[in-house]
């Protein structure tokens, strides 16, 4: 599969990693707050 625009793949990869980073922070925040309030 030949990609004509490699920059587009890089942007999608950054967007995906940003999404997983935010999801990880969100889950850690939920676990941390539940740990504090218990």
Swiss-Prot record:
Transmembrane region(s): 17-37
Location comes to: Plastid, Cyanelle thylakoid membrane
Give the organism the record lists: Cyanophora paradoxa
Q: How does it sit in the membrane?
A: Single-pass membrane protein
What is the top-level taxon of the source organism? Eukaryota
Question: Which keywords belong to this entry?
Answer: Cyanelle, Membrane, Photosynthesis, Photosystem II, Plastid, Reaction center, Thylakoid, Transmembrane, Transmembrane helix
Q: Which GO terms describe its biological process?
A: photosynthesis
Provide the function of this protein. One of the components of the core complex of photosystem II (PSII). PSII is a light-driven water:plastoquinone oxidoreductase that uses light energy to abstract electrons from H(2)O, generating O(2) and a proton gradient subsequently used for ATP formation. It consists of a core antenna complex that captures photons, and an electron transfer chain that converts photonic excitation into a charge separation. This subunit is found at the monomer-monomer interface and is required for correct PSII assembly and/or dimerization.
NCBIfam families the record matches: PRK00753.1
Q: What is this protein called?
A: Photosystem II reaction center protein L
Family matches, as SUPFAM superfamilies = Photosystem II reaction center protein L, PsbL
Query: Which Pfam families does this one have?
Result: PsbL
Its subunit composition reads:
PSII is composed of 1 copy each of membrane proteins PsbA, PsbB, PsbC, PsbD, PsbE, PsbF, PsbH, PsbI, PsbJ, PsbK, PsbL, PsbM, PsbT, PsbX, PsbY, PsbZ, Psb30/Ycf12, at least 3 peripheral proteins of the oxygen-evolving complex and a large number of cofactors. It forms dimeric complexes.
Recorded GO cellular component terms are: cyanelle thylakoid membrane; photosystem II reaction center
Q: What is its main location?
A: plastid
Q: Which family does it belong to?
A: Belongs to the PsbL family.
